[in-house]
Amino acid sequence: LLCNKPLINYTIEEALKSKYLDKIILSTDDKKIAQITNKFGITVPFMRPKKLAKDNSPMLPVIKHLLNKLEKDYSYDPEIIILLQPTSPLRTVKHINEAIKKFLKSKSDSLVSVTKLPHNMNPYSIMKLERNGNLKKFLKYDEKKNLRQLKPIFYARNGAAIYITTKKTIFKKNSFFGDTILPYFMSKIDSIDIDDQLDWIFAETIIKNLKNLWKIK
């Protein structure tokens, strides 16, 4: 439990607040998680196949399987797909709505939430370990110049907390991304993606502090 609440609840509660989501569907192989979501009225039309529920299973085949089965067995054929992964507990309905509105106003065929990379993770700071044991700069640059000032800003997917794409893009490109990818910028704090125990501790600390701030207000 993250601050006495199942991790998935954070995503469900915020998704339910959005006026833009016509239907919320959960893909899982865990009956306990399915029971939790049923209490919220979230649809779990079928359990995810075991072959698509391994720790290293990529998300794209899961979504393609879900869409194919929804169309074949339930005659449900959505045009726009919004993927909200449960490992982003600080992603709120505000983020969801803003991302959807940005996507709908654009001519892009995909959107992904991103956060700015810190100085030490910028590609110009990264070094590659060669087979001979030596380090090599990942990108070349003029060391006579102030690198901090010259570095271009790079962004990375934050989990990603939000993916928006079309069914057409998923099956035509075999990817969540089409030819035009729109960014939705999120802060470092809101971008926390729980992948290990340290991420969990960070998220728990931030949530507890936010609660204290709300109490003060």
Located regions from the model:
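N-terminal glycine-rich phosphate-binding loop and ensuing alpha1 helix
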Residues: 1-27
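Short phosphate-binding loop-to-helix
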Residues: 16, 25, 31-82, 91-98
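A structural signal for isolated positions on well-ordered beta-strands in alpha/beta enzyme cores
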Residues: 23-25, 111, 182
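Active-site-adjacent beta-strand anchor residues
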Residues: 26-27, 113, 163, 193
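Short, surface-exposed amphipathic charged segments that create phosphate/polyanion-binding patches used
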Residues: 59-64, 125-128, 197-201
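Conserved core of the sugar-phosphate nucleotidyltransferase
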Residues: 61, 80, 89-180
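Conserved alpha/beta core of the MobA/IspD/sugar-nucleotide pyrophosphorylase nucleotidyltransferase superfamily
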Residues: 154-217
